[in-house]
Design a protein with these regions (language model features):
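Peripheral, non-transmembrane regulatory/ligand-interaction domains of membrane transport proteins
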Residues: 1-227, 231-234, 238-241, 248, ...
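Hydrophobic alpha-helical transmembrane segments and their immediately adjacent juxtamembrane loops
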Residues: 237-332
Length: 332
């Protein structure tokens, strides 16, 4: 699906849902800014927009249509034989966390950012793209005056989308902590390890993404106007805070795992303690039973009138004495 918008330099909507054969004409008009959004496009739509209209470099087109596990930004400057305009190609990931499945769902968003155009490409619907397009059409602050403004709004929306996911993750970690303290089971351990794996996956996404935004925050690219650099820096700072939260969650999960192992060790120790107590307390009974269970005829106690009573009394007294000694030592 292709959605397209043309805005004036004052941020007002000029036209939308533009026919592809008209896009080159609008691109040539420097008083307009063209935003083309490709959402799960067909091969023909991809070829027409990326190759035939904008003439993007084949390597960036290949990176766009193929899933890229790591965020990145690349600057393309045309040579004499090239037909494209200078542009930035960027790969960014949005995330969503499902407590039901316990996994982070990653969605890739690709940017082609030029002086008077922005092309976005994604395989699944993204709330950040939808929200930004609605803001461009309805907002009174006229954010659609230039592509670098809209790109900033998109990036800010993507980074903000991390926060609900982290809130869900925080609730999940809190539940795991309670389970580890109150009723640790094998399922609790599996859940701790799974969530820790997902947090590590999140940090692997955020790390390169921070590097990408840091380059914008430092003002490395000429296509980002100087007065917008502080806004990109603010987005980078927000992502840095999210990165710190992810590190804190990793530390929390490590602590919860240690609590689980300690609780499991304590439970095992209690079982061993109980079994040891039973074994020691019943030792006198076993000794007396074993002694008088020998099949020797010449055992005077076997013929004694009160032999049974004496053996029983000895067993009871020895068992009681053992129990009293353990109790005095506070071994149970």
């Amino acid at each position: 699906m292709i959605r397209s918008f043309a805005f004036t330099t004052q941020g007002r909507l000029h036209s939308k849902d533009i026919d592809t054969f008209l896009m080159p004409t609008l691109l040539a008009d420097t008083s307009l800014f063209l935003w083309v959004d490709l959402e799960k496009p067909t091969d023909d739509e991809t070829r027409i927009v990326l190759a035939d209209i904008f003439h993007f470099h084949p390597l960036s087109i290949e990176d766009c249509v193929m899933f890229s596990p790591s965020p990145k930004v690349e600057e393309y400057t045309p040579k004499e034989e090239d037909r494209f305009w200078p542009y930035l190609f960027m790969v960014i990931h949005a995330v969503d966390y499902s407590r039901k499945d316990g996994v982070f769902a990653t969605s890739e968003l690709n940017f082609f950012l030029g002086k008077n155009f922005l092309v976005t490409y994604h395989e699944v619907p993204l709330r950040s793209v939808q929200a930004t397009s609605e803001r461009c059409l309805k907002s009174t602050v006229q954010i659609a005056r230039a592509p670098d403004r809209v790109a900033h709004t998109l990036l800010d929306s993507i980074v903000e989308s991390y926060k609900p996911a982290l809130d869900e993750l925080s609730l999940e970690i809190g539940d795991l902590e309670q389970q580890a303290l109150q009723n640790p089971t094998r399922e609790t351990l599996n859940k701790i390890l799974q969530v820790k794996k997902e947090v590590l996956h999140l940090r692997q996404i955020i790390g390169p993404q921070r590097e990408v935004l840091a380059r914008f925050a430092r003002g490395e690219f000429k296509l980002i106007r100087a007065h917008l650099v502080p806004y990109y820096r603010d987005v980078h700072d927000s992502l840095f805070h999210i990165s710190e939260l992810a590190q804190a969650y990793t530390d929390s999960l490590t602590g919860i795992l240690q609590v689980y192992l300690n609780m499991s060790s304590n439970q095992t120790g209690e079982v061993v303690k109980l079994l040891t107590m039973i074994t020691v307390i019943t030792t006198p009974l076993m000794m007396v039973g074993t002694w008088y269970g020998m099949n020797f005829k010449a055992m005077p106690e076997l013929e004694a009138r009160y032999g049974y009573e004496v053996a029983t009394a000895a067993t009871v007294i020895a068992t009681a004495a053992t129990y009293w000694y353990f109790k005095k030592k506070k071994w149970f």
